Amino acid sequence: AAEALHPLHGVSATFSVVIADPKTGICGAAVASKYPAVGKVVAYARPGVGAFCTQHWHNPKWGEHALDLLERGHQPEAVLGILLKDDPRRDKRQLAIINLKGRAANRNPANADPAGHYWGAMSGRFYACQGNTLTGREVIVAMAKACEETKGSVADRLMAALVAADCAGGDHRGRLAAGIRVCKPDVKGYWLEMHVDKSDDAVIDLLKKYNAANHPAKGQWKPGHRPFQHPCPNRPKPKAPNPR
């Protein structure tokens, strides 16, 4: 019983996004957090299947397992139900999943740690975004808005969502790590994978790597035009929301 009070793998307080494009079959996930190397333990995707994120009290063993269940034909909501059914830490989990039809599902931590405030999630047409330990609800709203309004590829939209969340305040503890993973049906493994494992400004550093990359996962940009110049370079340092 005592063990159930503690995370098995870590507390990855964070914000993340999953996106799928049914027309191209491209899918992916992106994440940022104060947790080191967060992109390697929270965000998962698989060609021809979909994308998944496990966070707050994350369980990296669920990454491939969730995608296995999705590949076997389970709907996203059912996958999350299977994962959580016998999990003694289910009230601490925050999960998101999407299949290649664009059907998404979220679960929020019903008993989040006090430091996990603010937490929340939103989903829409072909995306889901979620977060905990945020500066406020505006972080989730900003991610959703970026997913809805950004023109370009799946990778572009994932990056835009991270940048929007960062501008809105992001993780109230800081900006240590970020990552993006994108899959394409005819490419084994990750088509695009970038990580910043430790940094003073991880989203900005990931953005710089993305801007500098010559990769077909990125949208068609006009010569000399980089669409993700950070719109809020002078944003204030993150801080926890006022207690309710």
Model-based region annotation:
Residues 3-244:
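N-terminal nucleophile
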